[in-house]
Amino acid sequence: MLILTRRVGETLMIGDEVTVTVLGVKGNQVRIGVNAPKEVSVHREEIYQRIQSEKSGSSSEGGNF
């Protein structure tokens, strides 16, 4: 895992097309902005895990149409 330190307003690049910018820090919360192409999905981890579990749940239900 790469660990970086950034200040408010600073940005990091992921590849050539994705940027992550620190927008603010309040207590133990950090606001970040992610700028990515439409074809790149960006989700919070808990939402991504729910999407994945729903996908695997629907694919294991059979598919008898």
From Swiss-Prot:
RNA-binding keyword on record: yes
Keyword Repressor: yes
Keywords: Activator, Cytoplasm, Repressor, RNA-binding, Translation regulation
An annotated Gene Ontology molecular function: mRNA 5'-UTR binding
GO biological process: mRNA catabolic process; negative regulation of translational initiation; positive regulation of translational initiation; regulation of carbohydrate metabolic process
Subcellular compartments: Cytoplasm
Transmembrane spans: none
Pfam families assigned to the protein according to its UniProt record, in alphabetical order: CsrA
Entry's family note: Belongs to the CsrA/RsmA family.
Self-association and partners: Homodimer; the beta-strands of each monomer intercalate to form a hydrophobic core, while the alpha-helices form wings that extend away from the core.
Protein name stated in the entry: Translational regulator CsrA
Species classification: Bacteria, Pseudomonadati, Pseudomonadota, Gammaproteobacteria, Alteromonadales
